[in-house]
Amino acid sequence: MDEWLGIKLATGRCSQLLRRQLAVHAARRCYDVHNILDEIARLEGLQSRAAPTKPAEPYNRNPLLKGLWHKHHFQPRFLFANLKRETKRIPFPESTEEFNQNPDWKRLVYKLVFGAFENRTRRAALTGEWIVFAPLNGINYYLTLANHSTGDERVYARAKSCLSEFPELQPVLRS
């Protein structure tokens, strides 16, 4: 993992916690860790093969997480959720009645799957789970992975556990 991170990090620093999470995901083969590493490379301003995901954003919903940011990374298993969100966002131009009278299943499937995915990628709006990091003085500190069901307190506790490695983050991770 350290060798791969060495290729993807320009000035950023990566916590031992995140390194362990990546190693576990690689060993279990439950994530393509290279997709995560490519997102880190993108955040570092390096050439990247990363999927067109949403831009990095600060955590705004909870003051506890102020100063932390998250960046989506995409995995194939997130495809259905992305397609579902996209098809809800953009209704079909044809009416249901018109389709019922002359069903063109191939066109419908294409629009539901390929069309929705193309729209989402064109807008760089793919979503997935998160890389949690803290930008400070031009350096990104990559702390942990999280998902939509990881509670804010847990994200904060994981991030705060990295203070022994990165004491300079104390102002960001104030309690």
Model-found features: residue ranges?
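Basic, Lys/Arg-enriched alpha-helical interface segments
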Residues: M1-G128, N137-S175
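Hydrophobic/aromatic beta-strand elements that line small-molecule binding cavities or substrate pockets
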Residues: I131-V132
